[in-house]
Structure formats: C-alpha cells, structure tokens
Amino acid sequence: MKRFAAVTLAALMLLTVFASAASAADSVEIRGPVFNGSNIVEIVGDGITIDATQFAAFYYDIDDNVTTETLSIKDVSGNSGNVIGEGGIVYSTKIQKVDYEYYKPSLGWDNYSLLGFFAEKYIPLKSNSADKLAKLVIDSDDKITLRTGETLDIGQGYTLQAKQVDVDGEKVWLEFDRDGEYVDDEIIEVGADDSTWDVELDDIQDEDDVTVMRVHVNQVFQGAVDSIAQIEGIWLIDYANAMTIESDDEFGDLDDVSINGDTLNITNEDTFTLTRDSTNELAEGLSFKVADTSSNVLRFYLAKEFTDPGTYEVRGSVASGEASWDASNFAGFYYDLDDNVETESLSVSELNGNVIGEGGLVYTTSIKKVDYDYENEDAGWDQYPIIGFFAEEYIPLKANSADKLAKLVLDSDDKITLRTGETFDLGEGYSIQAKQVDVDGEKVWLEFDKDGEYVDDEIIEVGSNSDNTWDVELDDIEDEDDVVVLKVHVNQVFRGAVDSIAQIEGIWLIDYANAMTIESDDEFGDLDDVSIQGDTLKISNEDTFTLTRDSDEDIGEGMYFKVADTPTSELRYYPAIERIVGNETTSITKPDESGNETVSDNETMPDNTSSETPDLNETDTPEEPTTTPEEPTDNETEPDESNGSPGFGVVLGLAGLLGVVYLVRRNN
C-alpha cells in the first residue's frame, strides 16, 4: 500500500505540473486582400471596395452567388499619409434572400431574409427593414433522432425536447426551451402535408408574430426499444438578444449610421489612423492590420477575428473559370505582413467545362526568409527560412531545400516568467522547465522536454557579455544532424518578493518529432506529381480533376475546392481550408442515463447500444490555455492563480487526499 500510494501521489503531482498543457485554438483570423503603397492616397486612388468574393469573413452564398456586405475606402479630401479622412470608410450591408439548408419549397422551406452584419449572419425581424436584427443560431438539414424525453442542445442556450413520440398516431410532442425555461410546445402531425412547427413570438424588439424557430419532423418510427422522432430541418434565431439599430448608434470608429429600408450604411465621422505595427480596431471585431514599415511605406489588410467555438471556412477569391491564387487572394496561404512575404500559389488551367486536365492543377511553394518575432540581430535573432505547405507554416531542416520539413510550433516575443521548478507548455507536447535560477550568478538552468521525457538542458548565462540564447541542436532528424529545433532567449533573472525568477523573451520551436521527408513519388490527395527543385516544391495532378457541382472536392492536406450547385456552364468555385476554434460538442441529453446517440448525414437506424450524436451547433466555452504565472513588469500582468485549467483543483485535492491516506497507513 505504501508503494502504491507513493507512486500514485507522484503521478498525480506530475499531472498538476502539466495541467496547463490542454488547450484549444482560441481564435482564428480571416484576412482580406493586402493593400500596399507609399501612402493612403496612392493605395485608394479613385476608391477601393472589398466584398465577400475577396474577404472570406463577409457572408457569401456560393450556390446563389449572394453577398450582402461591402467595405469601401473612398477618395476623400482628408486622406493623407496613413490617415483616412472623415467619411472615407463606408461599411454597407443589404438584406438578401437565401435558401434554407433544408430546401423543400413545397413544404414552405424555400428561402428567408438574411443580412451580413460585420461578418456575422443576422436575420431581420422584418424582411425589408435592416434596423431590427437577431443573430442566426442555426440553419441545418442534418438528420437528428430524438427518443421520448431526450433534449437536443441547439445552441446559445436554446433546446428542443421530445416530450412524447406517438408512432401509431404519427405524432410527436416537442417543447422549445431557453436556458431551461419553457418557451413554447407543439404536437406535430407527421403524416400531414406539412410537418413543420413554426414558433412565433410577440414583443421581440416591439415586433409581433416573429418566427424565431422552424423545425421539420421527417418521420416517427419504432426503434429496438424506444419510439423515435427524426428531425430534418432546423432554423433558429437568437431572439433573446435581438437588437434595434438607431441612427445615433456607434460601432467602434464607425459612428455615422444611415438606415434606408433594407440597406444599412455606416461611416466614420472622424479621421481614422492606420497606425503602423498594430491592429487598428474598426468595429465589431473588424480591424485593419497594419505592417511594421518605414514612414514611406503603407501596407495593411482588413481582418476579422472569430473567437466563438466552431469550424470556420477560410476561402479564396471566387472563380468561374481558369484562375490562380496566392496569399493576396487566398487568406489560407501563409503570409507575413511585416516582411511582405508569401510562399504559396495554386493555379487552375486546362479547364474543360468542369474538368481540369492532367497537370492543370498546380500547387507551388518556395522557401523564404522572415524575421523572428523576437528581433535581436546581435543575439542571433535575425531571420529564419520558412515555407508554407498546404496553408500551414513549416520550417525546412536545410535552409535551401524544400524536401525535409517540420511544422513551426511557436515563434513568439511574449515575455514569460518562470520560477524555480515551474514548467512552461510550449505546445504539441513540448515544454521547458526552470530547474534552478541563480540571481547572484546571473544564470538559469533550463530543461527541454517532449511528452514529459528529457531532451536537453543548459545553464544559460544572462550577463551582459552573453547573447543569453540557448539553441537546442539535435541529430538524426530525418537523417539531418545539427538541426536547431528550439531557440530560447532569457532576458533577465531577478528576485521577486519570494522566489528567484527568470524572464524569457523570445521562443522559437519546430515539431521535430513529426518532421517529414517529401519524396518524388509521394501523393497529397489528388496532387500526385511531385517535383522538388532546391528551395521550391511543385505538385500537380497526374489524372483529370473534376469540379463536381454542389460538393467539396479535396485537393490535398485539408485544402479543397467548394463548388456551387450550378450547371456546368455557370461554374463557380473557390479554394478553402477549415480552421477550428474551441471544442465543438453539442449534445442530446437522455432523460434517465448519460450518453448520446450517433447519427450521420446518411441516417442509420439507431439501436439500443447507440451512444453519441454529433452536435448541430457549438455552445460550450473552450478551455482557456493556462500559462505559468509571471512576475508583473511594465508589459506584464500577473495572472490570477485561482483561474487554472479545469480539473486542476480536483487533481490537487486528490493528491492531498492520497497523501493523507499514505501517512495514516504508514503510521499504522
């Protein structure tokens, strides 16, 4: 028992050290086209306009070729240098009709009014007026099965419960709730011509008879044990958070509002400065990201940062025939704004109807040099080679050869403080630990680990005669030796109120454990003709590639073409990748037991052992990454140690409890 308790206690304490490692991506940035010139007057010319075909964050329906939003920079008298004059920025959006995902016109599921509003989907409470809006929560044609008593989490606190399922009478009794409170219920006859339930509510921003939810019940049937209702078609708006836009409202720096029927225009009453080396907030999450350049160069792009959990599509510009994309018109490709560096391109030629001929689909990428985020040439932090590879950042193991690559894990100039014994999670299972901090001797002993296993360690001298940088070099990485896999710059060591502390400023890391060698006979999806010429990698299709209508056609490594549901003569498509924020987990809650039921788009009849259903729409809040507490400096904030990773306190509690058990058993 003593040995068991001691080993268990040690294991639990080890868990507490790495409890901060579990985290999910907490945001995704989608950018628009890059504008580059000497000043705003040169860039704007007679005026520039960005719409959804250029900016993937704006709403776009590829099937119907529908856009609603534009952002323009006008040629106004106040434009000068890096300053946009009064009224020079115009955001405009207009209500449009779009098809339901569950498209059944004969059942009343044809189209509805939608308005993009600062790159989010909103529904006008009145179909021809843009002043009263509610966010669209879900528009889905997924097939979902509910047993009697089960509750479906739709998103944003809204749920749907199957109160009773009457198979013989072909009826289902559904209840609609918000935050656990009753909203409405209905008995739906499934054998009727229209088995749709429209939930209409009054007094939504002073509007009555507002349709807030639509549910179509496809069928009811008897399962192996339970009576089951199958839903196909759900549409819901967040009516509880609907809003009315007034002419005196302000949205960030856009504060001159004009509402004209189905159109909303908002401009800037004051000048707007594109401050270099910064993100200039415009309104509602829209911003201009501006490069760190000299005063005679101005370079920027429009961006939207999404933080709500979910899967986001990052798309390129829309094409209707032969086309090409690079980082300027496909936000998925790697781009360094400060250095104006891009590496990737994709081209389509030899297009006959909707078929790309052999060798007509070509992906190319080349190695380029970019600055470290921590810029310090004297300490060896100047530039490093990088290559975009299917919209991910990779590092070549040899600076001029594109055949051996490792993914870039981290390139950061954030200030991090480590006390003696503390471990900092770098990502992908890598970590560094401050073994000892010697303030008097101006030294720090760091250890580098992978998945908790020792890799290397070093005593770093922090004195003025040292570059304060630890380069971790490893051998036999894809048969290459002396590969720099980690760079760490220690800024200073100092004594805090209690502990000796090391401050790190500058970390760079590659995922060497998953490095790869690309061979000429490799295949990447439908790209299977590989050519490596020094620092350039070119991959094309040996066979024809069909742009099948109404589909996502995989190109390779997560990149795909989304093709509109149109005749071949009206071909419309774009390249895209997906980025995931948070942890997507919508659930069906069972009445008497835990567990969920799995239902795919191709419905399989569930049995009594089914356990999981995929979520319709994300509602859970993602876990925030937990970093090591830092000693406050001018640019640092001491984190609240009470807000650790979920479960951290539980682990400590279990460790303490087992410690008591161990001591009691030892004394006995």
Curated annotation (Swiss-Prot):
Keywords on record? Cell membrane, Cell wall, Cell wall biogenesis/degradation, Glycoprotein, Membrane, S-layer, Secreted, Signal, Transmembrane, Transmembrane helix
Major location (coarse) = secreted
Q: Does the record bear Secreted in its keywords?
A: yes
Highest taxon, organism lineage: Archaea
One biological process term in Gene Ontology: cell wall organization
Q: Where is the signal peptide?
A: 1-24
TM segments?
644-664
Q: Where is the composition biased (Polar residues)?
A: 596-611
Q: Does the keyword Signal apply?
A: yes
Compositional bias segments (type: Acidic residues): 631-641
Q: Which GO terms describe its cellular component?
A: extracellular region; plasma membrane; S-layer
Residue ranges, annotated region (Disordered) = 584-650
Post-translational modification note: Glycosylated.
By its UniProt entry, which InterPro entries does this protein fall under? PGF_CTERM (IPR026371), S_layer-rel_Mac (IPR006457)
Primary role: S-layer protein. The S-layer is a paracrystalline mono-layered assembly of proteins which coat the surface of the cell.
Q: Which family is this sequence assigned to?
A: Belongs to the Methanosarcinales S-layer protein family.
Spell out the protein name for this chain.
Major S-layer protein
The root-end lineage is: Archaea, Methanobacteriati, Methanobacteriota, Stenosarchaea group, Methanomicrobia
- The protein's gene is named slmA1
